[in-house]
Amino acid sequence: MLSIYPAYFCKEDSGYSVIFPDLNYLSTCGETLEEAMEMAVDCLAGHLYLCRQLQEPVFPPSKPEALRPEEYLKNIYGDLPVPDYFITMVSVDVDAYAREHFEKSVKKTLTIPAWLNQEALKRGLNFSK
């Protein structure tokens, strides 16, 4: 299922800050616009996935016309000037993203100390899982 949330992309000296107003100041950043968008997708997917895993409620997305970015950003930046920004919708299929990035198994071969191996064998630890 596709999840779509509005995000504020704020132009900073070092790139872009991305803030999801509906998700309690959830934010990320990127040096370029492309990187900021990739990070926004990853951030949104990770947040929604974690909420699902912890069975926490997720706030529904606002309609873009209901947002009040100047007020919201002023609250974040305080006395600093609000940077140039734009609003865009960020979408992600959390299930598909999780399968590819969060739930994917990776085979690794590693060396452990002999004492740790003996202890694991004593406790019946399955090294395959």
Segments the model singles out, each with a brief description of its role:
Residues 24-35, 109:
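A short, exposed loop/beta-hairpin motif centered on an aromatic-Gly-Thr core
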Residues 122-129:
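A short beta-strand-loop micro-motif that forms or neighbors metal/cofactor-
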Residues 1-14, 19, 97-99:
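N-terminal segment of the canonical double-stranded RNA-binding domain
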Residues 32-49:
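A short, charged, amphipathic alpha-helix used as a generic interaction element across diverse proteins
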Residues 21, 31, 122:
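Surface loops and adjacent helix of pleckstrin homology
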Residues 21-24, 113:
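Short, proline-centered helix/strand-breaking motifs
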Residues 2-4, 45-111, 115-122:
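Short, charged, surface-exposed hinge/linker loops at domain edges
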